[in-house]
Structure formats: C-alpha cells, structure tokens
C-alpha cells in the first residue's frame, strides 16, 4: 500500500504551523533578552523550575535542552556565577548536585512565564486550528 501524496494544502499547513512556532520562539527569545538573559539561560531556568518530581541536575538540563553535557555544564556554571542558581547535594543521592533557583531567578522566571502564557493564549486559536487541520 503506497502512502498518500502530499497536496499543496498539506505543505501550506506545515509551513503555517512552523511559522507560528517560529513566531512564538522569536517572542520568547525577545522576552528573555529584555530581562538580561540569553534564550538558553531562560530555557535552563524553566527546565530547572519545571522539573517537578525529577531532580534537576546538569544531566537533566542537558537532556531537556538537547545539549552535550559539557555545554550544559558551562551554561549551569554561568547561571551560578550570575547568582541565578545554586547547587546543593541531592537528598536522595549525595553524589548528585541538585540545581535550585535563587529568589532573583524565581522573580525573573515568573515574570517571563506570565508573559509567555499570555502570548500562548493569543496564539491558541491559531494553534488549535492548525492542529485540527492535520486530522482533516
């Protein structure tokens, strides 16, 4: 059985979806820079804060941001030098260092996250329509 061929509308849908994602990414990068963070630093802070039950470690950040361990280590060191994170021995495994946000980072991340949620609310109708169209 052969796969169905792509139609012009399929290409347009994918192009529109990617353009919408790029719009959000550009917004996110601009917001991060407006508070003195690089986009990657913002992503790392969000990854650490959003780790939930998982212990945020350098390896965890590397995996979530799709970075090589040495790149993640450098990123974490720069965040620590900037006073945005601390490293603490993990209560469950003293060999691991758990990453924690400082109060300064918590404030920055909360402001950024609120702005991102508002932007997503704005983009939601477009994203929902695009995703719904994939099924059609």
Task: Indicate where each model-derived feature is located.
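Short, hydrophobic-biased segments on the C-terminal half of alpha helices
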Residues: 58, 76-77
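Charged, amphipathic alpha-helical coiled-coil/dimerization segments
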Residues: 77-135
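Pre-recognition alpha-helix immediately N-terminal to the DNA-recognition helix
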Residues: 16, 43-47, 107
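Amphipathic, non-transmembrane alpha-helical scaffold segments
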Residues: 18-21, 25, 65, 109, ...
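N-terminal leader segment of winged-helix/HTH proteins
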Residues: 1-35, 82-84
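N-terminal helix-turn-helix DNA-binding core of bacterial DNA-binding proteins
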Residues: 26-68
